[in-house]
Design a protein with these regions (language model features):
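N-terminal low-complexity, intrinsically disordered segments
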Residues: 1-82
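Long protein-protein interaction modules used by eukaryotic assembly/scaffold proteins
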Residues: 66, 70-144
Length: 144
C-alpha cells in the first residue's frame, strides 16, 4: 500500500486511496484524531468513526473489523464509498508510519498560536502526545 496520508503542507493534507480521496484541513488535529479516536478505538475491537471538517464539506471514515468506508458530503446526495476490505491491518500500519515519518509537521499542523514561544511549547506538547499514542498503538496486542 502506498502513502495514504500526505505530508501536511500549508494547512492541508490528503488521505488517498485508489477509489477515494479527501482533503484534510488544519481545523482538525488530524494526526491526533487518527491515532487516538480511530486506530486505538479499532484496536479495542470497536467500530471506529471519525469526521473531518474539510472546509466546505465533511469526510467521515468508518472502520470495522474488515472494512473501511468513506462518506463525503461534497456531493448531493453525499457519497458513500467502500474503500477497502481485508487490508485493514496494513492500512493502520501505513497511517502510523505516515504520521511517524512527518511527526514534526503533524505536531505543528493544527497549532494556531502566533506567539513564537507559545507556538514552540504547543508544538512540543503535541509531539510528546503523538509519540505516546504511537508507542501505545505499537504495544497494543491487536496491532501486531
Amino acid at each position: 500500500m502506498s502513502t495514504l496520508l500526505a505530508t501536511p503542507s500549508a494547512g492541508w493534507s490528503h488521505l488517498s486511496f485508489p477509489n477515494f480521496d479527501t482533503t484534510l484541513s488544519y481545523i482538525d488535529d488530524v494526526a491526533l484524531i487518527l491515532l487516538q479516536d480511530f486506530i486505538l478505538t479499532y484496536l479495542k475491537k470497536q467500530v471506529a468513526a471519525v469526521t473531518f471538517d474539510c472546509e466546505g464539506y465533511d469526510t467521515t471514515l468508518v472502520l470495522s473489523n474488515y472494512d473501511l468506508y468513506g462518506i463525503q458530503t461534497n456531493t448531493e446526495p453525499a457519497s458513500f464509498t467502500h474503500i477497502l476490505d481485508d487490508h485493514v491491518r496494513e492500512f493502520l500500519h501505513q497511517l502510523v508510519t505516515n504520521i511517524e515519518t512527518d511527526l514534526d509537521k503533524w505536531a505543528s499542523f493544527s497549532v494556531f498560536e502566533t506567539d513564537k514561544e507559545t507556538y514552540k511549547k504547543e508544538t512540543a506538547k503535541n509531539k510528546t502526545r503523538l509519540q505516546a499514542l504511537i508507542k501505545e498503538i505499537k504495544e497494543h496486542p491487536n496491532y501486531g
